[in-house]
Amino acid sequence: MIRGIKPTFLLFALLGSIMLVNLVLPICNLLLHPDWHRWLAAIAQPASLEALKISLLSSCSAVVLMALLGVPLAYVLARANLPFKRFWIALVFLPMVVPDLAGGILLLQTFGPNGIIGQPLDSRNIELTNNLAGIVLAQIFVAAPFVIVSSIAAFSSVDLKLEIAAATLGDSRWHIFRRVSLPLAWPGIAAGLTLAWIRALGEFGSTLIMAYNPHTLPIYMWVKFESDGLAGALPAAFCLVVLATAAVGISMLLSRFTGYADIVTPFGKAAGTGR
């Protein structure tokens, strides 16, 4: 053992434990609270169940659309020799740093009744605000970067020689993508989809502006907090944390069974490497 490493490691462990407590203690305090059975009863109320249904339906719809649209975009950004490539990738990152409420304003300006896209649609009685479509648009805006960025990293980690070998054997670009690139990059893509679903499920700010009604679970939680205080908001918060924890746990289990224990979750190695 190299001299000096142990004290440094202990110092880093101490500093890291402070951060870990800050991250984990609030969640554990919620999950282990003695009133959780009362919160489950509150969640079983019709208004809570409706908000939960809207959240699950919208977040799952958003993830499907992010997979269908975001993964191909990531493949192009990872493999194509595009001009100003760094600029296009930087654009993908922008929604991650734009405040949620500001993102909602931008979406409303674009897709609202007077927006450049919303106005022509509104004249045809197609509305993109205050409905499920508005919720999905808001969720995609804030969560899609997780899918795209993870997928870019996943596709970039696939050995280009494998794609070249498939091309020399006569495979089309579509077959190379479907039979070589996508399977090898899938663990990293799955990590991005998992994070995106959790992010979409908990989205509040942009949804508040784009589609206050129907209430998603985060908005319902805010309404209950405004009317009943902390006690009224805790059941919805408990439900969201349980769903997020379950999603991460399922992702870790799937990674173990598929042989990618270190990469299907957001905690490990680069995509495309097995055990």
Predicted ranges, named:
Residues 258-267:
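Short, Lys/Arg-enriched, Gly/Pro-containing loop segments at transmembrane-helix junctions
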Residues 169-170, 183:
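Glycine/proline-centered hinge or cleavage motifs at structural transition points of membrane proteins
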Residues 166:
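The alpha-helix within a helix-turn-helix
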Residues 214-216:
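Extracytoplasmic catalytic/substrate-binding loops of multi-pass membrane glycan-assembly enzymes
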Residues 2-37, 46-156, 180, 184-200, ...:
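Membrane-water interface segments at the C-terminal ends of transmembrane alpha-helices
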Residues 162, 204:
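Helix-turn-helix DNA-binding elements, focusing on the entry/boundary residues of the two helices
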Residues 83, 171-173:
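Short coil/turn motifs that cap or connect alpha-helices
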